[in-house]
Amino acid sequence: MLAGCSFSSSRHQMSTAQRFDILPCGFSKRGSRGDGAAPRVAGDARSGATTCSFRTHPAPPVTQSVSWGAKPEPGGNGNGAHRAVKRAHDEDAVEEYGPIVRAKRTRMGGDGDEVWFHQSIAGTMQATAAGEGEEAEEEKVFLVPSAAAFPHGMAAAGPSLAAAKKEEYSKSPSDSSSSSGTDGGSSAMMPPPQPPEFDARNGVPAPGQAEREALELVRALTACADSLSAGNHEAANYYLARLGEMASPAGPTPMHRVAAYFTEALALRVVRMWPHMFDIGPPRELTDDAFGGGDDDAMALRILNAITPIPRFLHFTLNERLLREFEGHERVHVIDFDIKQGLQWPGLLQSLAARAVPPAHVRITGVGESRQELQETGARLARVAAALGLAFEFHAVVDRLEDVRLWMLHVKRGECVAVNCVLAMHRLLRDDAALTDFLGLARSTGATILLLGEHEGGGLNSGRWEARFARALRYYAAAFDAVDAAGLPEASPARAKAEEMFAREIRNAVAFEGPERFERHESFAGWRRRMEDGGGFKNAGIGEREAMQGRMIARMFGPDKYTVQAHGGGGSGGGEALTLRWLDQPLYTVTAWTPAGDGAGGSTVSASTTASHSQQS
């Protein structure tokens, strides 16, 4: 996490330069400062006595040093948690390559598993109250302004925020916690926070306090987003400070933890919205997710594979569809455009080897940006294939998804080719031309089928930022609840590692815009429109076998929480798509597509495709 840091206007030498502090321990207690000023509500016609919560430098701005290293634990070197996670999951690595087994789990002690939301920004967000739990003392680390320390009583020069909110409530009895933020009106403020309740015996939050804080966190997040939409940096600063006091990646409920990462993303967005006021140099992992994931993403994916059905649902369901496509073919070729650690393919190799007549040759082409990771994945898959007695070949392509060309893929005559895209194609939605080119590349391989596994975004790709923020909060709150349901201990480094993978998605989806925002999740209906209207593909359907596989995996991890929904099909059979849901929230959808108008059926690669490869080679 972030260590102590401050940043100032080093490029813009202005007398109005502001400072944004990031401290490793949250914020000072409300009673410790008496000079905090309540933020001015956007459009407020009251007196200008209210001071700006972004403090002005008393002296000319000076470039300040920044330290982003994580604060080590007392008496340790800070690497213990990483080693503990690695040991725990290296022992279980063989499970990822074997048959599906029932995961051993325990349930959390609390009884508050469901998440309920109330109406909020643009009528799309709902507040949540998560389960009970006692919050231990922990160090809170957030990208939030430490200068925004407000006294508990919220006393300040001029009209206080509490008084303003009281007047607002007296005018409108409805419990509205946000506004559209686009009409120039005031940004909605949440009710004055109440003093936290503590158990006198051990100093931890009293029973029920965690649920109340979870509800307040949702209100603060939506109000902060509303303030950003209204251009009110003073109110946004206040809410970021308030969120920093309550939210924590080690919090007692999933809402505390997901709110911590949304707070960080909102703070990054503040910096990007007012670059003339603030200057920050965060580490590359905060701004470049492709660089910052690395080994952390690899380990997080393995952990997620062990504690949730998400990777297994995507991989095994698509593998069942792929096996049906490869039936009767002697030479098969899978092109995986984001292979990562190759967790999907040992199961496929086992199924192919178990056939009465296994294929004579199996080729997997893996695309990725890390040469070392691709080499390790290829060696691991080669060992699995050798143990199964399969003739196997792995081909690595080191390049970005949008830069791959046909000649790099080594497609050969006589192969039955399948294209696999799991959690990869959504990164192309930032550029329609790039997506069109990629679909053209997929068709040019002569593939008989394109397998697609993606987030069921439901509007996270387009629309107003406020609405996208609300949908993202609902989506990732459900994802954190799903991780929490695995029953890992509250201080588990494995759980933290899995949640940090979602945090990188949150950071990009909330803080960035334009070409820099590549976490653009689309719904199944949106993907169908893109694939069929100009993409050159038609839906190939998901069969009953695939549907049974997906439902079996969901039942393994939580029959009362996870469900699998078929689109365009009835009964227990398949349809056009399958969606994995957590309670009422869709999470991930798998689909299969075949080139439209392929009269020959696409069973073999055309002579022109082979000739193109030969010329380039």
UniProtKB/Swiss-Prot annotation:
Superkingdom per UniProt: Eukaryota
Signal peptide: none
Stretches the record annotates as VHIID: 301-366
GO CC annotation: nucleus
PTM comment: Phosphorylated on serine and threonine residues by GSK2. Dephosphorylated during response to brassinosteroid.
Protein name, as recorded: Protein DWARF AND LOW-TILLERING
Tissue specificity: Expressed in the shoot apical meristem (SAM) and elongating cells of young seedlings. Expressed in leaf joints, culms, internodes, stems, young panicles, primary roots and lateral roots.
Keywords: Brassinosteroid signaling pathway, Nucleus, Transcription, Transcription regulation
Subunit details: Interacts with GSK2. Interacts with SMOS1 (via C-terminus).
